């Protein structure tokens, strides 16, 4: 998985996120922007997709135009609870909170490529990341590949 501006996760700062937002790229294979109104269901779909493919980042409190809108409905506890309650198995993830000069809170959720796929949502669906979107996997060959990847770990 790539890093934001080539920074290791523990060294990531707000300025690195701001530089990412200034770049010409929109949402990509590794980055998903979500505003504060995003539903828990959509967050879980994105996390499932990232964990089932190559990992990635959700930048929460940032709209599709890469404007910082901030978060009032989401906090670290809600993010953790949503992930713990709605995905099986639990993927490897971490959350960082940043506060802008304008006092807007944003969260960066880092999702690792999973070692024990498939990562299944609480409604029984399995997602994958394709280009800049997350989609349910309906192809039996792709599902078989995920289960095979899991078996390789044991």
Question: Each predicted region: which residue ranges?
Answer:
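Conserved N-terminal catalytic/coupling substructures associated with nucleotide/phosphate chemistry
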Residues: 1-154
């Amino acid at each position: 998985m790539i890093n934001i501006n080539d920074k290791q996760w523990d060294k990531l700062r707000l300025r690195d996120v701001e530089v990412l937002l200034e770049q010409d790229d929109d949402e990509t294979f590794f980055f998903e922007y979500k505003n504060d109104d995003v539903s828990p269901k959509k967050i879980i779909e994105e996390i499932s997709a990232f964990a089932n493919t190559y990992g990635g980042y959700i930048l929460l409190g940032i709209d599709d135009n890469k404007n910082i809108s901030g978060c009032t409905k989401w906090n670290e506890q809600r993010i953790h609870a949503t992930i713990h309650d709605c995905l099986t198995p639990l993927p490897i993830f971490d959350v960082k909170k940043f506060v802008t000069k304008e006092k807007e809170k944003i969260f960066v959720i880092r999702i690792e490529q999973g070692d024990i796929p498939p990562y299944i949502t609480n409604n029984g669906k399995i997602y994958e990341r394709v280009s800049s979107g997350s989609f349910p996997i309906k192809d039996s060959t792709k599902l078989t590949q995920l289960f095979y990847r899991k078996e390789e770990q044991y």
